[in-house]
Amino acid sequence: MSTPQLSMKGQWAQRLIRTKLADTINQSRQVFPLPGAGHPHDGFLLPGQPPEVTWDNLPQDEWHSDQEQGAAMFSAAEVEEQMPPRKVCIIGAGVAGLYIAMILDDLKIPNLTYEILEANERVGGRIYTHHFSNKVHDYYDVGAMRFPKIPIMDRTFDLFCRTKVPLRDYYLNGGDQCPKLFNDRLFAQGIDPYHVSKANGGHVPDDEVDKDIAGDAFKPYKEALKDDFNKGWKELMKVDGFSTREYLRVGGRDGKEKKYDYFTIQWAETQNTSTNLFDQAFSESVMDSFDFDYPATKKEIDPKTNKEVEVEIPVEWKCIEGGSTLLTDAMQKMISQPVQTKKRVEAVNIDPTTALGCLGRMDLRSLDLDPSVKDAIRSLHYDDSVKVALKFHYPWWIVDCGINHGGTASTDLPLRTCVYPSYNINDGAKNEAVLLASYTWAQDATRMGSLIGTKESEKELVDVILRNLARIHAKDTTHEAYEAMYKKVHKAYTGTYHVHSWSHDPYTSGAFALFGGGQFSKLYPLLSFPAANGNFHIVGEASSVHHAWVVGALDSAVAALYKFLRKEMLWGALIKLRENWKVPEEVEIGINGTAHLQVGYDAIQRKLRKLEA
């Protein structure tokens, strides 16, 4: 697995962790020595240290000196053989929990075993494929379904290689054939195709109707971060408490930027994301946008002009042929210990990889958690997500609408997004086909989810979606065109469907972490630090800088293992972990890294709490 260049999100995570550590050390250094982090292990603040530390001047990790590593490796095998028996308990058999098990099997640490407890009868967590039958392509991915081949996703694709799952192309963009319907109008070329501007009877100012106002607001911060991360980070932190909506409304921190009215902001949100997602942190929106600053470009010589030009490198998107569950199925087969399913955990003094909503229902009193960690578990915002798949007698979107290259349809109707599968485009015009008819997030998902649960309500849900599909795919917006399309879609529908709401799922209690204003800068470091004297690690996408992605769950698993091994001083295993699995950028190892301080953070906080009491 290659080591990617440090991402912008990685730099952000490192800075937040360093700032939190510096603040805590400065708070405590006048009161007591700090245990459990440096070398020797009776404290790392030695005489002669400066009176105050800063994010870029933290106590060093002396183990990373050549002399100390050499001495540690010389005796590592003998010491590890003499270690007392220990067990790692992994709560949750999603991709993070299974990944931890795979790594522990590879490390082969003497006298260390593990067990995996899963409350659900199904293994995989938020990687979940629903099969309507055993027929080829008679499925859809309820959870993770598409993976961009970009540098920050290297660990995910490395896992694909290790598990040998079959990949195929995923078509994110299906071209002009994929319909868009907003304000009861199908897309047409022009400045205001949906007639929401004041000139066309709407409420959005004419000069703003076709602008990317969110992208324009993000741009100066992104450019500042690229030019000089330290200066850019300071500027971004000044607006960390703003939601995207509030930032656009008031014109930034000082009110000197462009201010937008309610209708302009609403229209921008409708076009760019799901209902109410502009309520997430502005800083989070800025950093998230870096993930999709692709395609990249490369320089080539234009044969016509013989001049150097920049050529776009399109991003490859992949999906797993047969469904994403093949990944977690393969991982489960590779690990040495069986997953214990239907094991409901009521109290915790071990390592959870479960979602925070589920963790919050467990009795955590024995852990003596920092109050702010308890607050993070309770209050960190999770987004909702609902998917509805319908099965049809034939792929009418291909046969009747010419949508034969995947992609998505977008609308302000309740279904919001329709996803045309990439895996069944060549299955023939007469075979049954599954369509991801509705994919919603945030408030759109909450409202769609309100129709889940009873036969009558789900009958209404399916009817709404069938009618929405007809309106979106009709050749025009006349009633006659709609009726004709509705008859076609309704006749093609087999009567078979599947619906899933992640916020209604008792094993997840939400789809993925989506930090609100100020939450990432304040809560992320706390979620990433070990607790309970280094024995408790919160693992999963919520405790990663790349939350809401599979790679975030994988990164958090490696980060937790590294800090566990560092705390136990298992030097040989640490080096093997670095060589075989790489360490995510937010851990920051090396003599000037922060991993040793993250391990010691909980001990500092415990002493501070006792003094304050």
Give, region by region, the residue ranges found by the protein language model.
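Conserved flavin/dinucleotide-binding core of flavoenzymes
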Residues: 3-72, 362, 400-613
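Mobile amphipathic helical/loop "lid" adjacent to a hydrophobic cofactor/ligand pocket
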Residues: 3-24, 161-162, 169-284
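Glycine-rich active-site loop/strand segments that organize a redox cofactor
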Residues: 4-19, 23-39, 125-155, 174, ...
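N-terminal glycine-rich phosphate/pyrophosphate-binding loop and immediately adjacent elements
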Residues: 77-223
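Generic structural signal for small/hydrophobic residues in well-ordered secondary structure
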Residues: 124, 160, 248, 331, ...
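Active-site/ligand-binding neighborhood in enzyme catalytic cores
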Residues: 223-348, 352, 359-360, 385
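Flavin (primarily FAD) binding-site architecture
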Residues: 351-372, 386-389
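Central beta-strand plus flanking loop segment that forms part of the substrate or channel wall
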Residues: 371-399
